[in-house]
Amino acid sequence: MDDEVAALVVDNGSGMCKAGFAEDDAPRAVFPSIVGRPRHQGVMVGMVQKDSYVGDEAQSKRGILTLKYPIEHGIVTNWDDMEKIWHHTFYNELRVAPEEHPVLLTEAPLNPKANREKMTQIMFETFNTRAMYVNIQAVLSLYASGRTTGLVMDSGDGVSHTVPIYEGYALPHAIFRLDLAGRDLTDYLMKILTERGYSFTTTAEREIVRDIKEKLCYVGLDFESEMGTASSSSVLEKSYELPDGQVITIGNERFRCPEAMFQPSFLGMESAGIHETTYNSIMKCDVDIRKDLYANTVLSGGTTMYPGIADRMQKEISALAPPTMKIKIIAPPERKYSVWIGGSILASLSTFQQMWISKQEYDESGPSIVHRKCF
C-alpha cells in the first residue's frame, strides 16, 4: 500500500450512505441510500431525462419519482441499484477513481454470508479497487468512542443490534440483532398520523414523515405519565409545515413513535425491546466481564439520536440489572456518524495496513476470501 493514497471509507446504511477519506474526522458525503425512477412519461423534448436518480437528487425530485431503498434491514436486496449508489459515491460525491484507492466497507452483524461475498466481488470486478475490507458496524462505533471494551447498541434505519466487545474481540455468541429500526418507526408514524386524519401513502410522502420524525420525536422517560400529560394539556403539541404550506399538529405521536423501540408490540412484533436486548446480550457474556459492559454501554446510529433515549435506557437497564451494579450509558454527540468515524480511524492505523484484501489475493481465492480475512 502506498502511503500517499488515502483509503476510502464507505458506511452503507439502509437509510443513509456515509462516505469519505480515512483520517478525516467526518464523512465528506452523506446522502440517502435511495434510487428513484420516474413514474411518468417524459414529454419535454430536449430535456435530459435520466432513467434513474440517486441520493439527494432523487430526494429533491421525489414528487415525480418512485423511490426505492436497495438496502433493507442491513441486507442488500437489489444489487443493480446498490452498484448505482456506489458509482454515485465514488464518481459524483467523492470524485475519485476507485481503482486507485483501498476501500473499507461496513455491514451489519449476522448478515447472510453471500452479502459480503457479493460486496467483495463488485468492488474488485466492477470498480477494480486495489484492496478492500469489510468490517462490522458496531465494532467501528466502539473504536470511535476510544474504547476497546464495551457493549454497542447500534440502531440505524434498517437494523438494530447489540454487540458486546471485550478487549477488541466481538463476542459472536452474545450478539443480538433486531430487525426493528428507523424505517419501521417512520412507517409506524405514518400509520398513527393517519389516525389523526393526515394521510401519507406514497414513497415520496414517507420521506416527509421521516423528516417529521427526525425533527419532532423524542423518547419519554415514563410512557404512561407522558400519555397522561398529552391527554390533559396541549403542552406537548408541536406544529410542522408540509412542503405545500399546510400546517399539521402532532402531540402524543411525538413519543409514541420511538416508544416502539422499547415496546415492539406497538408494531405487532413479538421481540424484546432495545433495553431487554441489551440486557440479554450482557447476560450471554461471561460473568467476569459483565461489570465492564454495564459501565460501558455505547449508543450509536441515527435512531439513537432521539432526545431522552439515554436516560430511558439508563432507567430500563437499571431496573433489569443487579441493584448494586454501576450502569453507564454513553451517548456521544457524533453518534450518528460514529460507525464512519471508527472506519476512518481503523483504515488509517499503520497496523491495519496488512489486513486489506488485495486484488491479487482476490484473484487467487475468489469472493470467499472475505470470510477468512475479515472478522
Swiss-Prot record:
The keyword Endoplasmic reticulum does not apply. It holds the Pfam family Actin. One of its GO terms (molecular function) is ATP binding. It is an enzyme of class 3 (hydrolase). InterPro entries: Actin, Actin/actin-like_CS, Actin_CS, ATPase_NBD. Signal peptide: none annotated. This is Actin, cytoplasmic. It is found in: Cytoplasm, Cytoskeleton. Polymerization of globular actin (G-actin) leads to a structural filament (F-actin) in the form of a two-stranded helix. Each actin can bind to 4 others. The keyword Cytoplasm applies. Belongs to the actin family. Keywords: ATP-binding, Cytoplasm, Cytoskeleton, Hydrolase, Nucleotide-binding. One of its GO terms (cellular component) is cytoplasm. It comes from Styela plicata (Wrinkled sea squirt). Gene3D superfamilies: 3.30.420.40, Actin, Chain A, domain 4. Actins are highly conserved proteins that are involved in various types of cell motility and are ubiquitously expressed in all eukaryotic cells. Its EC number is 3.6.4.-. It catalyses: ATP + H2O = ADP + phosphate + H(+).
